Curated annotation (Swiss-Prot):
Its EC number is 7.1.1.-. It catalyses: a plastoquinone + NADH + (n+1) H(+)(in) = a plastoquinol + NAD(+) + n H(+)(out); a plastoquinone + NADPH + (n+1) H(+)(in) = a plastoquinol + NADP(+) + n H(+)(out). Pfam families: Complex1_30kDa. The keyword Oxidoreductase does not apply. GO terms for cellular component: chloroplast thylakoid membrane. This is NAD(P)H-quinone oxidoreductase subunit J, chloroplastic. Its main location: plastid. It comes from Panax ginseng.
Amino acid sequence: MQGRLSAWLVKHGLIHRSLGFDYQGIETLQIKPEDWHSIAVILYVYGYNYLRSQCAYDVAPGGLLASVYHLTRIEYGVDQPEEVCIKVFAPRRNPRIPSVFWVWKSVDFQERESYDMLGIFYATHPRLKRILMPESWVGWPLRKDYIAPNFYEIQDAH
């Protein structure tokens, strides 16, 4: 079933794939990494002016990595704002996705966390570096194929 935004994107020749609706009825779309930045700018101009959240996850061991964006169209006088969920999948070997920092500044720390935990490189992000783990940390802790280093934490006995 095609949603309102998907129909609008098709009408304007913008390539995407409809993934249906989530349990709350929010339309979910898949966008290719190479198309993501231009479609993000178009969505912002179309009225999706608020990035509610960005997160990332490992789809399957050895499989794709996903970057997920929850966007909201906030308008004066509208009680129920329109929402959309965008999923951008990237290959594990070279997970590169264009950053949308210059479209929605609120994605700054969220893209950095996705980089830090899963190793997704957000091209054109102005400060893409580790945010939770030490700079010297090797690997991406939230990947399903991650092997934890062999060390033990010293805990206080009290």
